[in-house]
From Swiss-Prot:
Its cofactor is Zn(2+). It comes from Chlamydia pneumoniae. CDD domains: ThrRS_anticodon (cd00860), ThrRS_core (cd00771). The keyword Disulfide bond does not apply. Zn(2+) binds at C328, H379, H505. Belongs to the class-II aminoacyl-tRNA synthetase family. NCBIfam families: thrS (TIGR00418). It catalyses: tRNA(Thr) + L-threonine + ATP = L-threonyl-tRNA(Thr) + AMP + diphosphate + H(+). This is Threonine--tRNA ligase. The gene is thrS. It holds the Pfam family TGS. Catalyzes the attachment of threonine to tRNA(Thr) in a two-step reaction: L-threonine is first activated by ATP to form Thr-AMP and then transferred to the acceptor end of tRNA(Thr). Also edits incorrectly charged L-seryl-tRNA(Thr). One of its GO terms (cellular component) is cytoplasm. One of its GO terms (molecular function) is ATP binding.
Amino acid sequence: MIQVTCDQKNYEVLEGTTAAELAKQLKNSHQFIGVLINERPRDLSTHLNEGDTLVFLTSEDPEGREIFLHTSAHLLAQAVLRLWPDAIPTIGPVIDHGFYYDFANLSISESDFPLIEDTVKQIVDEKLAISRFTYGDKQQALAQFPQNPFKTELIRELPENEEISAYSQGEFFDLCRGPHLPSTAHVKAFKVLRTSAAYWRGDPSRESLVRIYGTSFPTSKELRAHLEQIEEAKKRDHRVLGAKLDLFSQQESSPGMPFFHPRGMIVWDALIRYWKQLHTAAGYKEILTPQLMNRQLWEVSGHWDNYKANMYTLQIDDEDYAIKPMNCPGCMLYYKTRLHSYKEFPLRVAEVGHVHRQEASGALSGLMRVRAFHQDDAHVFLTPEQVEEETLNILQLVSTLYGTFGLEYHLELSTRPEKDTIGDDSLWELATDALNRALVQSGTPFIVRPGEGAFYGPKIDIHVKDAIQRTWQCGTIQLDMFLPERFELEYTTAQGTKSVPVMLHRALFGSIERFLGILIENFKGRFPLWLSPEQVRIITVADRHIPRAKELEEAWKRLGLVVTLDDSSESVSKKIRNAQNMQVNYMITLGDHEINENVLAVRTRDNRVINDVSVERFLNTILEEKNSLSLTALL
């Protein structure tokens, strides 16, 4: 007999017992599709060992969802091979909200999608058992794929001592680490989404492939909800809205480096202005460091050896330089410009820095994935005893900032990786415990990601949920035990000795471009007044009303409002439609009655009309709406 643990209970089972056999002793075992054994995702068919700790997975768990989608990718490949036996499968990974599989020697169109889906349904109805098997060595594995140069390339690159596994379901088998579902019967709802061209290993010099994207769910209801979400996401696409609202553009001359238009800069400036106010009140000092720094700096920071492939480099006077991909090293140099005392700690230093990173052209996407962006970094220098309290301060800042935009979020604590880390065990334990206690005190829900911290320290990641329930990783709080030592930073302790400070590195927006993209989609282009690129548009009925309109425009601009005037010859109804299409918060129509009575006809972008509003009431209301950072209209 061996003893294992599940749900904090101990179980004695026979040697050779599988996770699936243990699951039969538990409630709702029919929902289990996989298992975490000692925190690693595994098949239900996995044999248990003495001391194992188990957590059974359903399709609602992140790890279970990944297993579900991974198996669905195999179903897609099996269906394609049944329909086009000469196709050559390559790889089929899980991606956000679905999966894809790449094929060589295949040509299909959208008209083939129903045929693929019908074939997948047949495979599901066959309830094929999914089995894992391993190869004794590389030669045995290579013999399994004699006609597939892609699989053989992958096999040859594996380390000599690495276990090589494959999975089979019916006539189909595929090289794969797994884990997978117990059978094909679980995939009740399957959808082919689109196809695209691809290259083997993303290299344009290699073989051309056809990529088929899909998604799947345990029920048709869940699939329908997901497809509705996709349609809603299309309506909210920040790239479409960014062009429609004249906020930003992408130019072929500079891929992945957005061009912000005047209207976009109004939103940008409002974001930065709010960020500065928030950080000034929280005791941060702002700096600005250079874009370009020499190789020596990047060697000290470790970027030259470990990150050079993602950096833009150049030579000046025979010396190597790089455009900064991160703000951190520049802040280290600022810290070293003078001596520091423990009395200054926590020393909070913030920077909105423009950084550049090499990204594959195929990975670029609007404002979400770019090569040039602004990062709102801050570095807090402190003593080990101050870590918990300062982390709590940062978490309160996070709550304030995201609450201002009406964004829900959750936090994830990533702990020490198993290998290739710096710092001794006691320091890691102290740092992780401090972050954990701060999270508990904050009262914000969080989950723990064992082993997913950075090599230089544990971290807290901020995941935002938008209006259509998508999640985005934005900000981060990282305890860095690496850079202060690399740059030989020091401070004077209370005892008069020199010591290396602890450093908390944090970003709240993360990439400001990306955060703006999230806001555009979350608000569907309908920005709250304080963020809006056009808060008020004055619409004249006739030319004789233009002088009064200009008078109001100039007066309101002096109050800090973003006001425009439409005195064109278009009809009033057309002017109103134009303003509504640009998501202007308030439209003011000026005619004879309004001028004679010194009142305003106000129309909201929701098409509510409020007549005979006094100028004083209108201004007082919208200035309150703007200054209070209200997310809803107050008029």
